[in-house]
Amino acid sequence: MQIFVKTLTGKTIALEVEPSDTIENVKAKIQDKEGIPPDQQRLIFAGKQLEEGRTLSDYNIQKESTLHLVLRLRGGVMEPTLVALAKKYNWEKKVCRRCYARLPVRATNCRKKACGHCSNLRMKKKLR
C-alpha cells in the first residue's frame, strides 16, 4: 500500500509499505529517500507520535494515509569558548547607580537623560 509523509517544508514523500511494517522500517525508507537519519525523525499520525516498536496496523494507518515528519530538536552543552564569550559580553559592563542603565566598560558618563548623564557608575556584579 502507499502512504504519504509530509515534511515541515511542505514536501510530500510517497512510500510503498505494508501494514505489518514497523515504524523503524518506515523511518529507514524515509532515510533512503531523504537522507535524514532515523534517530532524528519523529513521525506523527492523528496527533500522536509513533513509537518505534509498533507497526502501521497498530496505529490503524491505512492506504493513502498521511504521516507528518518532524525533526528531533538537538540539545546539549555550549562549547567553553562560547560560554566565555557570552560571559565577557554580558558581564563586562558598567551600570549607572541612579538609573541602572547598562553601559560599555569604557563609559565615563551615563547615556540616559533621566539621570542627567551622571558620572556615578559601577562595574556590573558577576553572577555566582
Swiss-Prot record:
InterPro entries named among the record's database cross-references: Ribosomal_eL40_dom, Ribosomal_eL40_sf, Ribosomal_zn-bd, Ubiquitin-like_dom, Ubiquitin-like_domsf, Ubiquitin_CS, Ubiquitin_dom, Ubiquitin_ubiquitin-like
A single GO BP: protein ubiquitination
GO CC terms in record: cytoplasm; nucleus; ribonucleoprotein complex; ribosome
Signal peptide location: none
Residue ranges annotated for the Ubiquitin-like domain, each copy included: 1-76
GO molecular-function terms, A-Z: protein tag activity; structural constituent of ribosome; ubiquitin protein ligase binding
Record cross-link Glycyl lysine isopeptide (Gly-Lys) (interchain with K-? in acceptor proteins), residues: 76
Family matches, as SMART domains: Ribosomal_L40e (SM01377), UBQ (SM00213)
Pfam families in the record: Ribosomal_L40e, ubiquitin
Keywords: Cytoplasm, Isopeptide bond, Nucleus, Ribonucleoprotein, Ribosomal protein, Ubl conjugation
Record cross-link Glycyl lysine isopeptide (Lys-Gly) (interchain with G-Cter in ubiquitin), residues: 48
Family: In the N-terminal section; belongs to the ubiquitin family.
Name assigned to this protein: Ubiquitin-ribosomal protein eL40 fusion protein
Gene, per the UniProt record: UB-EP52
